[in-house]
């Protein structure tokens, strides 16, 4: 269950932040929350769970998600990462370049097919 894992990760990050209040802790795991990730991140930052929201795979699928969030807009669901992990499969191959096979398929699907199948 992905949401159980996300909850476990975020509460663990919150414990680390509480234990080290002078160290800015960056979250992880927000990609699983898709278009709701910005709202969850904002609430967690407000409540002191972590200092900054970290987006990894999401930025490969949706490179301008930070701009969307800062503009006060909800991220577009059809641009969000679907957490398929194909980007990490490509990255782990020799000479692999991470990218979103789903959202940028014109570029990364041929690479994925060549290197991962």
Predicted regions and their residues:
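Flavin-dependent oxidoreductase catalytic cores
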Residues: 1-117
